[in-house]
Amino acid sequence: MGEYIMEKNTIILGIETSCDETAVAVVKNGTEIIANVVASQIESHKRFGGVVPEIASRHHVEEITVVLEEALKEANITFDDIDAIAVTEGPGLVGALLIGVNAAKAVAFAHDIPLVGVHHIAGHIYANRLVKEVQFPLLSLVVSGGHTELVYMKEHGSFEVIGETRDDAAGEAYDKVARTLSMPYPGGPHIDRLAHEGKPTIDLPRAWLEPDSYDFSFSGLKSAVINTVHNAKQRGIEIAPEDLAASFQESVIDVLVTKASRAADAYNVKQVLLAGGVAANKGLRARLETEFAQKENVELIIPPLSLCTDNAAMIAAAGTIAYEQGKRATLALNANPGLDIEA
């Protein structure tokens, strides 16, 4: 599983439509971005306070061809130059995933190009390989709107989830707390910005769970924030939103960083990779850097902001490994919203 032979200049076309970004990228050898085009739908979903699946799907239908053409143009290549097409098959919104999967199958069929299905979270993890070559064993802290997990990898293409959220993902908690503070969607960047202006003076819970557990839980924290705001309103007390944001963020980051640090020691890893949309959080990035600066034998890799949020370069990067390992999808490939990374 771990061994693969790198052919000379493998060109992979990546397609990502799992949520509210329509993205197509071209990546060389799994490490070099030739083109990376992303059409975001944030403006369309803002007024609803979250992603509306039906609207997301319609946007993907409108954008996919344009984004695909733009990526090929930016990379200055034709379909003849592509070794394989890598597409997100799951997890995600089923309607949104279908647009990308069907586009990938159509291109693969029309131009007789091999097809590879990619797990969305594997993509987030492999975004780090576009920054630096990964070394095994490694640990990835995946923090996004739908996922919060610690993934152990002993070799390429091998994923073991050693910790995951038991309820809300961290990104989900961020969005719900932002809504409580009347901030626009997506809430994460707004909370992060506000947190830097405040002080963590409000006592909020941290869910450590069992002593040896690497799992996460954020629903209690989210409820505590909502209750704090509600109780203050009832008593006519003014709570500084920046202090509440700072207190909430510190609670989330404390648990994420402590558990990642403990797992890195226990599994004796060479690298720790940050992955997922919440990886763009400045507070989290800073705390991880401080924590891992103290560990001599562990290298921390944090991708640039552009590779934290959903993009297709990461899907192409993960797809390169799958392609080189001989994995192929047939034209029966389907969207799988509940796809398991360990499968």
UniProtKB/Swiss-Prot annotation:
Its cofactor is Fe(2+). Required for the formation of a threonylcarbamoyl group on adenosine at position 37 (t(6)A37) in tRNAs that read codons beginning with adenine. Is involved in the transfer of the threonylcarbamoyl moiety of threonylcarbamoyl-AMP (TC-AMP) to the N6 group of A37, together with TsaE and TsaB. TsaD likely plays a direct catalytic role in this reaction. One of its GO terms (biological process) is tRNA threonylcarbamoyladenosine modification. Its EC number is 2.3.1.234. Substrate binds at residues 142-146, 175, 188, 192, 281. Fe cation binds at residues 120, 124, 310. Binds 1 Fe(2+) ion per subunit. The keyword Transferase applies. It catalyses: L-threonylcarbamoyladenylate + adenosine(37) in tRNA = N(6)-L-threonylcarbamoyladenosine(37) in tRNA + AMP + H(+). It holds the Pfam family TsaD. HAMAP family: TsaD (MF_01445). It is an enzyme of class 2 (transferase). InterPro entries: ATPase_NBD, Gcp-like_dom, KAE1/TsaD, Peptidase_M22_CS, TsaD. It comes from Bacillus anthracis. Its main location: cytoplasm. Gene3D superfamilies: 3.30.420.40. The lineage of its organism: Bacteria, Bacillati, Bacillota, Bacilli, Bacillales. GO terms for cellular component: cytoplasm. GO terms for molecular function: iron ion binding; N(6)-L-threonylcarbamoyladenine synthase activity. It is found in: Cytoplasm. Belongs to the KAE1 / TsaD family. This is tRNA N6-adenosine threonylcarbamoyltransferase. Keywords: Acyltransferase, Cytoplasm, Iron, Metal-binding, Transferase, tRNA processing.
